[in-house]
């Protein structure tokens, strides 16, 4: 299980990859954007102990989606940088990026499996290569990389993930 490591700013803190840092929007902008979507409605009815973790997952998913949909430059390389940051996070590495610091905390507290976060990144990689799915099964396979991991991560936040679900 990852730990937060040293506080940001200490000598042993390693900065995150420059490409991912450029693609990582400020948390305030992500939270502002969330207010214009359906996501925040649930936050008002949920116990406070879940809100921070859900907002963190939203911020990560939103960042990955924004890279896949709108980032300038080589989007696949930017997505590779996100995967590298996940590698660092799960290895117990330290970052100065507030989004990854919050994600490290949520990963540790909620015991989030890396593969679910990576599947979100993989869905956006696929978005760069596939623009139309030929069959319904192909579309379902894509959903297993996008919608499914979000649901699994949310279930983990609530400690409700199980084989039956």
Task: Identify what each model region corresponds to.
Residues 2-165:
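Acidic catalytic motifs of isoprenoid enzymes
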């Amino acid at each position: 299980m990852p730990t937060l490591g040293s506080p940001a700013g200490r000598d042993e803190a390693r900065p995150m990859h420059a490409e991912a840092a450029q693609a990582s929007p400020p948390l305030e902008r992500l939270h502002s954007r969330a207010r214009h979507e359906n996501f925040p409605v649930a936050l008002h009815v949920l116990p406070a102990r879940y809100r921070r973790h859900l907002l963190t997952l939203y911020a990560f998913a939103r960042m990955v989606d924004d890279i896949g949909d709108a980032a300038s430059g080589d989007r696949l390389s930017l997505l590779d940088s996100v995967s590298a940051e996940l590698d660092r996070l799960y290895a117990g590495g330290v970052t100065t990026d507030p989004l990854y610091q919050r994600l490290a905390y949520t990963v540790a507290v909620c015991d989030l499996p890396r593969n679910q976060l990576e599947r979100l990144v993989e869905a956006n990689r696929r978005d760069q290569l596939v623009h139309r799915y030929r069959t319904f099964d192909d579309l379902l396979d894509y959903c297993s990389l996008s919608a499914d991991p979000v649901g699994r991560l949310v279930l983990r936040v609530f400690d409700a993930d199980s084989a039956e679900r």
